[in-house]
Amino acid sequence: TSDRDLKDNIQVIDNATNRIRKMNGYTYTLKENGMPYAGVIAQEALEAIPESVGSTIKYRDGGSGSEGEEGERYYTVDYSGVTGLLVQVARESDDRITALEEENAELRQRLSAIE
């Protein structure tokens, strides 16, 4: 859910730019159906924003896990967590751009004064 009233311990994602550098965007073909997709790799998301990664168990032959049936555990990604990271990366980038623009304007003024 996105409603602030339903959340506790709200914190801005720190070091978002450094975190996002641990991830890439990919295109890929899903093994189970051969269809093309785009997205991220859960293991990379686990490094960057572990709060966005969960897991699921897939049972053989569509089983339900009853009677001690073993399945394989796979990671899943909640893309709302990745979106939150991307929003914070955009904000950090905007802050850096603004600082560089201000520095550039100051340097131009100093250069004009020298000329």
Regions found by a protein language model. Name each.
Residues 45:
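Active-site-adjacent helical/loop segments in soluble small-molecule enzymes
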Residues 8-22:
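Periplasmic N-terminal gating module of Gram-negative TonB-dependent outer-membrane receptors
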Residues 2, 9, 51, 55-115:
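C-terminal intramolecular chaperone/auto-processing assembly modules
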Residues 39-40, 76:
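Short aromatic/basic micro-patch
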Residues 2-9, 26-38:
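Active-site-adjacent substrate-recognition loops and nearby beta-strands
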Residues 16-19, 41, 86:
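Stable alpha-helical elements in mature extracytoplasmic
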Residues 22-24, 52:
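A short, compositionally biased
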